[in-house]
Amino acid sequence: MRFPSVALDTLIDEFAKLPGIGRKTAQRLAMYILHEPKIEAEQLAKALLDVKEKVVRCTICQNITDVGTDPCAICASKARDRTVICVVESPVDMLAFEKTGHYKGLYHVLHGVISPLDGVGPDDIKVRELLARIPVGEASGVREVVLALNPTIEGETTSLYLARLLKPLGIAVTKIARGIPVGAELEYVDEATLSRAMEGRTVV
């Protein structure tokens, strides 16, 4: 059943395209927007446009940052431990580790994991950019790379692939400790568990 308004139905269709949003939820969101003051709708529209126009990827770690703030705040900070790089799948996973307040090193965001079934290979994620941060035969300063990917089949496959590439570079390659349920997503794991996983990391 559709509303007798093309504009409203179009908005519902657009909301329904979002991950985790079914049509009923999309209808509730659209009706909420419809009954809010026009200024609220304008602010939402501006925020949507701004995130597409003003958010870029840090040229060093590939994390998200604002235009004009590259490198990102973490890469630019002199307080971070530059000898350690924690590799994560997404910016959301990076944020999960930051919330613990325990990890003080740098990050590298892959923006995905290797998944042959989905047609995603090493060239489709930020592997080359990671290797470029640890040049062979040069004093990059990096002493350890921590593989902190989600405990899924794809995450494990990606970790094994990265370990094979990184070990010959003469650095320590470690992995966050087990304790996170298989198939779980790091963004939903509590901070205490993430902290223990990072502190108890093991050599790959």
From Swiss-Prot:
Keywords: DNA damage, DNA recombination, DNA repair, Metal-binding, Zinc, Zinc-finger. The keyword Zinc-finger applies. The keyword Electron transport does not apply. A zinc finger (C4-type) spans 58-75. One of its GO terms (molecular function) is zinc ion binding. HAMAP family: RecR (MF_00017). This is Recombination protein RecR. It comes from Chlorobium chlorochromatii (strain CaD3).
